[in-house]
């Protein structure tokens, strides 16, 4: 089995199917009648798409009829160890009748973007490059997730190709070591910088992952056509999740003539075919597109066009990257079919230190960690039970290991005054970043 793509069971737990819950649900539905979904209210209104009524909303609440599905039943006992009763006799469920809903806790972070300044801070006294400090404050949160995904913006081609920043990035293999140490399970490599070091860099990166960490899911770059055609499947709790990764382009660098499959591009015909295959193989489909316009805090019409393509073909979750700033989160659903899709248009940068000095630079140091809980509805079908976003900030100081990303909620105003970003954009502060998060995400973020 090719661990870069298909069906690697990273983590698996034992589950049962819920006979009692299903029977109870059927009884309740029969009693309550049919819900008129056309009367559902949303915060952003509704839009007509291809003759179907599509509603969208921005909210941190779980959605679906079974948004809160976890029920724990246990016998109450008195001091003698016997089951106690109330005035109203109730039959207690047996051990076989007591179940908990299976869940997959997923997180994803945005671009890991290593400019020259950041590489200088990662260089140690012995000349080696170490990146563990970048992720240390968020490591526990990353490792706590069942499925942790990162968008690796720059190529990891190794020191032999030279360690370079903008415009043609390349990082040493120790960056990959740090990503694995931090707890990431899946690495998205389809970005506009995937071909920065041409075919040699691409193959070097692929070989690193295959030989050093074959258990890590690496998406978006391919050594063979067979790899391009495979669908990565993550399975846990009996739920199969397909993850697809694409980029809008490669900065004008052509794919190798003998490797037209090298990078997953946003080609509609191929994307739709991939989604169809994913829908057949998995229960839940995620698309991670590298799309949009850099430094714009709102999605573009092109992003919305692609979101509709994903939605129309059955995708359940979209988590976008590339703009280097955060963008809105939107939930779309079809009131006729009941299909729902959650879209994070952009998570911004998870790690970066660009050298520009101008208005808007401060926005690039605010990022988001998407948090999504995938569970089962009463019919045993996968659903999004809950979702949200954690605001993050990259702190930068000119010293070894002086760059790291932490929760915005744990960042202090005093610490922000020591950030080098103030010299690039003097509006940078904790208060300013909180204002941007409020503007883009509303009450969704934490």
Annotate each predicted stretch with a short phrase.
Residues 1-9:
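Short, Lys/Arg-enriched N-terminal segments with co-localized hydrophobic residues
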Residues 27-30:
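C-terminal motif of bacterial Sec signal peptides marking the signal peptidase cleavage site
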Residues 8-19:
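Bacterial N-terminal signal peptides that target proteins for export
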Residues 1, 39, 55-58, 75:
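Ser/Thr/Pro/Gly-rich low-complexity, intrinsically disordered segments
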Residues 21-25:
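Beta-rich carbohydrate-recognition modules and glycan-binding surfaces
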Residues 32-36, 45, 51, 63-64, ...:
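Acidic, metal/ion-coordinating pockets
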């Amino acid at each position: 089995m090719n661990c870069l793509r298909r069906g690697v069971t990273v983590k698996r737990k034992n589950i049962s199917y819920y006979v009692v819950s299903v029977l109870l649900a059927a009884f309740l539905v029969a009693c309550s009648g049919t819900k008129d979904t056309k009367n559902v209210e949303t915060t952003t209104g509704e839009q007509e798409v291809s003759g179907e009524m599509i509603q969208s909303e921005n909210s941190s609440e779980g959605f679906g009829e079974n948004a809160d599905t976890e029920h724990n039943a246990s016998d109450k006992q008195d001091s003698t160890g016997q089951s106690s009763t109330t005035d109203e006799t109730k039959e207690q469920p047996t051990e076989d009748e007591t179940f908990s809903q299976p869940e997959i806790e997923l997180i994803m972070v945005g671009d890991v973007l290593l400019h020259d300044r950041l590489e200088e801070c990662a260089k140690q006294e012995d000349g080696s490059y170490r990146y563990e400090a970048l992720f240390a404050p968020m490591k526990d949160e990353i490792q706590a997730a069942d499925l942790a995904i990162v968008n690796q913006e720059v190529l990891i081609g190794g020191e032999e190709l030279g360690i370079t920043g903008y415009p043609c990035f390349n990082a040493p293999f120790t960056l990959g070591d740090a990503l694995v140490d931090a707890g990431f399970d899946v690495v998205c490599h389809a970005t506009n910088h995937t071909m920065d070091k041409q075919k040699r860099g691409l193959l070097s990166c692929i070989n690193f992952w295959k030989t050093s960490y074959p258990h890590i899911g690496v998406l978006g770059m391919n050594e063979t056509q067979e790899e391009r055609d495979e669908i990565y499947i993550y399975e846990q709790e009996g739920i199969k999740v397909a993850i697809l990764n694409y980029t809008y382009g490669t900065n004008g660098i052509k794919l190798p003539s003998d490797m037209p499959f090298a990078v997953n591009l946003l080609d509609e015909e191929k994307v739709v075919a991939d989604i169809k295959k994913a829908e057949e193989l998995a229960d839940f489909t995620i698309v991670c597109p590298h799309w949009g316009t850099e430094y714009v805090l709102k999605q573009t019409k092109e992003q919305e066009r692609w979101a509709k393509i994903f939605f129309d073909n059955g995708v359940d979750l979209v988590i976008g990257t590339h703009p280097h700033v955060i963008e809105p989160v939107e939930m779309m659903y079809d009131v006729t079919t009941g299909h729902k899709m959650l879209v994070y248009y952009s998570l911004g940068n998870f790690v970066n230190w660009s050298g520009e000095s101008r208005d808007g630079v401060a926005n690039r140091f605010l990022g988001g960690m998407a948090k999504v809980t995938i569970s089962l509805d009463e019919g045993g079908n996968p659903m999004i039970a809950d979702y949200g976003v954690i605001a993050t900030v990259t702190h930068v100081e000119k010293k070894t290991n002086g760059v790291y990303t932490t929760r915005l909620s744990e960042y202090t105003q005093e610490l922000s005054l020591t950030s080098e970003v103030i010299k690039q954009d003097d509006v940078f502060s904790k208060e300013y970043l909180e204002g941007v998060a409020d503007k883009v995400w509303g009450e969704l973020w934490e």
